[in-house]
Amino acid sequence: MGIFRLFASSSLFAMQQKYSRIFLKPGREASLRRGHPWLFSGAVLSVEGRPEPGDVVVAATHKRESLALGFYNPRCDIVFRLLTTNMDETIDESFWIRKIRTAMELREKVIPRGTNACRLINAEGDGMPGLIVDRYDRYLVFSIATAGIEKNREVVLDGLLREINPEGIYERSEGRARQLEGLEDRIGCAHGNFPGTAEITENGLHFRVDMLTGQKTGFFLDQRSNREIVEKFSDQATCLNAFSYTGAFSVYCARGGAKRVISVDSSEAANETARWNLESNGFSPHEYPIVRADVFSYLRETDERFDIMILDPPAFAKAKKDVAKAARAYKDVNLQAVRRIRDGGILATFSCSNYIDEDLFGKIVAGAVRDAGKTARLLQTLGPGPDHPTNLAHPEGRYLKGLLLHIST
């Protein structure tokens, strides 16, 4: 038995020697022990070896106790991104295949019938930091935001092809997150034939998705369960879908029996897709009008009152320095919205800004309700659906925050 233990210990030591190690300052391992998947540069005491950006390293205490394996990148503030706390694990092709299979098995359990589009891999929420994969029927759209996934790009792509066998895969790896990791943008077809647009079904409804240039990867998959919730309130209601993008909330409200739905967005391209989405589900844009306008101006100028209002604006805070300005914008738009909701009406309001947490967002909306001279009852907190899992110890991963409110005088 002693020989076996010695052998196991020696094997573990040999495995860990494959990787460089980062040693943490005393006490700075606490967040990792709690399950948070990030370590920041200020937590690092020293580095053993010469790891390059994107390499797998061992995170260890200052007393040399090995804690976890993860991606290392000294170029950015998040210096370590957790992959596993199982020190017997080897980060190889089989590791990524297991991760992809686990993600697929979860989606098979949580995606409703009549739906062929979902978030297939949700970065840290699926143990693959920096990787987003969305499925639109027979096509995949993915983005890579970390140097670690970038180094494993071909292995991950091979795994997706093997496990899913899509007709086409398109890459949209771009934006500030890649810049912070020292990566250049990469956009283009990664496999097969890629038509640019897809027609999907969600809960039996039909939608067109611009996978090449649409926001995010073309469709707000994270709002699916929230659209179902709003639909339940829409019978005989007058609804305003503000920042309507391609009109998915509007289609759900129309199916729910709304007598009037107005969709407001500043993008004509998005509005054109919204018209198609309404018509393909049997709803005329003449009866359910689409307005190209700035939402802030529209809310100030309209005299109409609504039973239901949906506010799903773009991220107002894309960096920490933007928080104060973003808070003012969120308060302004919610104030104008609450003023135009009938007594007993419903407000579904959202923020997708990473730097606006749930507590701050709630305070902003409460201030807007108070300034409007109204009362709000919280019916439900809203967020992404179960195909967007997040690590419970990683609130930063829960970027979409929402409140379902009953508004009264």
Language-model-detected regions and their locations in the chain:
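Non-catalytic substrate-recognition/targeting regions of SAM-dependent transferases
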Residues: 121-134, 150-220, 228
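Non-catalytic accessory regions of SAM-dependent methyltransferases
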Residues: 3-135
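Mobile active-site "lid"/loop adjacent to the S-adenosyl-L-methionine
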Residues: 306-336
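C-terminal catalytic and target-recognition region of SAM-dependent MTase-like enzymes
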Residues: 346-409
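Conserved SAM-binding motif I beta-strand of class I
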Residues: 260-265
